[in-house]
Amino acid sequence: MTTPFKMERGVKYRDAAKTSIIPVKNIDPNQELLKKPEWMKIKLPANSAKINSIKNGMRRHGLHSVCEEASCPNLHECFNHGTATFMILGAICTRRCPFCDVAHGKPLPPDPDEPKKLAETIQDMKLRYVVITSVDRDDLPDRGAGHFAECVKEIRKLNPGIKIEILVPDFRGRIEQALEKLKDNPPDVFNHNLENVPRLYREIRPGADYNWSLKLLKEFKTIFPHIPTKSGIMVGLGETNEEILQVMQDLRDNGVTMLTLGQYLQPSRHHLPVARYVPPEEFDDFRDKAEKMGFEHAACGPFVRSSYHADLQASGGLVK
């Protein structure tokens, strides 16, 4: 008889320990993988002083970056430019999406001092634009929305004039309560990723719902019509270009004006494999179509991620 898997609180479960308990699809770690094309190969910068400086600054304050926790391919570039996306509410997610490298498990209670520590770190780094994201916290009554609001409040208190983008989870089952918590301390940009097409949601985002995510974006825009909303899509997971275009149209129909679209990369052999590497010219075509749909800002390219050059995109610069 097999002993049921029991998670310990505060322990990070990654790779096979994480994806083996997803009931939707078993991933064969020995399967043959697609070879990376030349356009997907990154040359890492030689100078790591800035990278170490940012990492050390976060360690001193007990903070996390999604750049490290999700193994982002742009980490070296962004850290060398002195930018990072902070991840609040711990580094353990209550979901176990098989595309994501963030650890799964039973998270510890939120750190009540984190908003102040975050604000002080941002002040030390002299940032003028900051992105705040989080793991999913389905264990919390408000799904972590109150903690987001407190972070925004403390950041603005110590950093007047700063621009704040929040990249939020779907606040499953608590949209109204979550948006109520954000009313007094809204961000400058509200970001929530759809990730991929609805046909593949059960496989890619177990525990999430496509229409629920659209509802979150729409309801935020209804309450805060002057604040831009943003969403991100990954390609290369088995979707068709026509399906991606429909997702883009769904976003526009729900008031979203900022888009990021990038290539999915497999974090390990225990994650979903890449079904296709989308060539750069197709990303250019997606950008052209996004602009025709009415997106004010569309960052489309192989290495584009949700917060990649977020400050540049928010100011209207071309990101690809």
Swiss-Prot record:
Q: Which Gene3D superfamilies match?
A: Aldolase class I
Q: May I have one GO cellular component term?
A: cytoplasm
* Compartment list: Cytoplasm
**Pfam families noted in UniProt:** LIAS_N, Radical_SAM
Q: What is its EC number?
A: 2.8.1.8
InterPro entries membership: Aldolase_TIM, Elp3/MiaA/NifB-like_rSAM, LIAS_N, Lipoyl_synth, rSAM
Reactions accelerated catalytically: [[Fe-S] cluster scaffold protein carrying a second [4Fe-4S](2+) cluster] + N(6)-octanoyl-L-lysyl-[protein] + 2 oxidized [2Fe-2S]-[ferredoxin] + 2 S-adenosyl-L-methionine + 4 H(+) = [[Fe-S] cluster scaffold protein] + N(6)-[(R)-dihydrolipoyl]-L-lysyl-[protein] + 4 Fe(3+) + 2 hydrogen sulfide + 2 5'-deoxyadenosine + 2 L-methionine + 2 reduced [2Fe-2S]-[ferredoxin]
Q: Where [4Fe-4S] cluster 2 is bound, by residue?
A: C93, C97, C100
- What protein family is recorded? Belongs to the radical SAM superfamily. Lipoyl synthase family.
This one is known as Lipoyl synthase
Q: What is the lineage of its organism?
A: Bacteria, Pseudomonadati, Pseudomonadota, Gammaproteobacteria, Pasteurellales
Gene designation = lipA
